[in-house]
Amino acid sequence: LALFDRYGELKFVYAKVHTCDFDVERNLTPGENFYVTTLDTPCGKIKTGAMICYDREFPESARILMLKGAELILVPNACPMEINRLSQLRARAFENMLAVATCNYPETVPDCNGNSSVFDGVAYLPDESGSRDTCILQAGEEEGIYIAKLDLDQLREYREHETFGNTYRHPKKYKLLTESKIDEPFIRSDYRE
């Protein structure tokens, strides 16, 4: 993924960290890092990161991007976007208090079904009782250009006061997450680092 700003400047090149170990993708070399850059948009500057398709299956991908300062994660995708995958994207936005924008191939592409989406990550508003739907755009199965209005001020205000994200983490207690040992039932003969 090559991310360019609106002036044509290359901001970063990202290679998918979590490659699938089947089909043609098993021949790819996984990326080594996640990147965040500041994009100067007509609506203001926004810290933007990216992950690709299968990266969304791993909560650590979005968490690393949040820790690097991302307010928005862009996710190009090429698979069926069904309720569980949409729920993953919703969860990544919610737990990291950031926006997640996904674009997917339309239903005319094999194994894809459109359903591009944007989740703004703002679960509560001070003037509303209860939680709110963080989905601000859900496209259909057809090809198209879709525009979502992301309220950056609302997102930033929310991040300053809510308890999710990085506020109450206990990183010292998560050592097991950085170990590379794989135990049953998760051992696969085609696994590679």
Residue ranges and their predicted role:
Residues 1-68, 76-77, 81-91, 112:
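Active-site catalytic loop in hydrolytic enzyme cores
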Residues 4-7, 12, 22, 34, ...:
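Phenylalanine-focused residue identity feature
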Residues 17, 77, 96, 162-165:
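Alpha-helix boundary/capping residues
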Residues 56-146:
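CN hydrolase (nitrilase-like) catalytic-core segments centered on the catalytic cysteine
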Residues 106-193:
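C-terminal beta-strand edge segments of enzyme domains
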